[in-house]
Amino acid sequence: MSAKAQHYDVIRKPIITEKSTMASENGAVVFEVSIDSNKPQIKEAVESLFGVKVKAVNTTITKGKVKRFRGQLGKRKDVKKAYVTLEEGNTIDVSTGL
């Protein structure tokens, strides 16, 4: 598997919410990442895919809720988010598509 394909396995999709839009005003971009990826992998993937310099990476894991479907209990998957802060002068425009 090539290095670029591995980077696409780390970064799943951008997250566009009100909170992520407010974070983008401070130079941060929010991505959904694979649950087993770590901060150095996320930093390397963002720098190689988008050609920017990363200042910091903060991650959070949101536990999946227990939901009921047709009387059966099920669980939504856990989601890991990465708040990637970029160096001054670097931007990623996720609203236009990747």
UniProtKB/Swiss-Prot annotation:
Q: Name one GO molecular function term.
A: structural constituent of ribosome
The answer to whether keyword Transferase applies is no
Pfam name, any one: Ribosomal_L23
The record's InterPro entries line, in alphabetical order, gives: Nucleotide-bd_a/b_plait_sf, Ribosomal_uL23-like, Ribosomal_uL23/eL15/eS24_sf
TM regions (residue ranges):
none
According to its UniProt entry, the protein's GO biological process terms are: translation
Tell me the keywords, alphabetical order. Answer: Ribonucleoprotein, Ribosomal protein, RNA-binding, rRNA-binding
Q: Which GO terms describe its cellular component?
A: ribonucleoprotein complex; ribosome
What family does the Swiss-Prot or TrEMBL record give for this protein?
Answer: Belongs to the universal ribosomal protein uL23 family.
Its biological purpose: One of the early assembly proteins it binds 23S rRNA. One of the proteins that surrounds the polypeptide exit tunnel on the outside of the ribosome. Forms the main docking site for trigger factor binding to the ribosome.
**Subunit details:** Part of the 50S ribosomal subunit. Contacts protein L29, and trigger factor when it is bound to the ribosome.
HAMAP family under this entry? Ribosomal_uL23_B (MF_01369_B)
**What is this protein identified as?**
Large ribosomal subunit protein uL23
Q: Which organism is it from?
A: Ruegeria pomeroyi (strain ATCC 700808 / DSM 15171 / DSS-3)
User: Which gene underlies this protein?
Assistant: rplW
